[in-house]
Amino acid sequence: RQEQSQTEKALALINTFATGDTDTARSLLADGYIQHNLAYGTGADAFIGSVEYLASADVKTTVNNIRAFEDGDKVFLQTIYNFAGAGEQVAFDIFRFDENGKIAEHWDNLAALAEPNPSGHTQTDGTMEVTDLDKTEENRELVKNFLYDVMQGNNLDKTPDYFDGDNYIQHNTGIADGVSGLNAALGALAEQGISMVYDDVHMVLAQGNFVLAVSEGTFGSTPTSYYDLWRVENGKIAEHWDVMETIADQSTWQNQNGKF
């Protein structure tokens, strides 16, 4: 049988949370699996332990993958999980594959599933189709520049260059569509003395018209991990999905690999 693609392997791995299939999980993972979700131990054994724990729970875990992308040795996924009935969560997962095709490292960001936002969009609906595979690097570069100029505030006067007028489809749970919607939300936060700061960009992954950025900063005074997925259309930023997560206090970490 044909070797599974990296994306198929990543999807097979997350599905073991629902099936309890430890053999499949074991076959997909590198022994030295590096976990950056700070609530879990690191290594393949810790992952298998989670699968076994979920399999034994009274309420079955559900895994509903929405989008899947591949970039070099990494796969990035947008998925709705409900772990043992604890409540639906929207997640971005990133898996790195080693030279043997095993899953060797994992990063993620999770947030509770919310009601539709002021423009009626959910955290996961919207455009699905991956296109413009010939523009992957161009789109990655555009988002890197956007992060530097706009999200990090280095050249805010360039903001209009990145958008087609006010057209911007927004899936953030608290913000309305349009560049105007984003500005209004940031203005309202500023009035409360809250700023959204992007200090470091750790990863910018891309496939065609979709680009995922992993950034570290603060929301108010809280250390925060930002996962932002942008869809690029004709060289402009057209649509945005995100998950923001507070970075847990180091005293609670179950591994010492760090969030990033």
Segments and roles (model prediction):
Residues 1-260:
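C-terminal and inter-domain tail/linker signature
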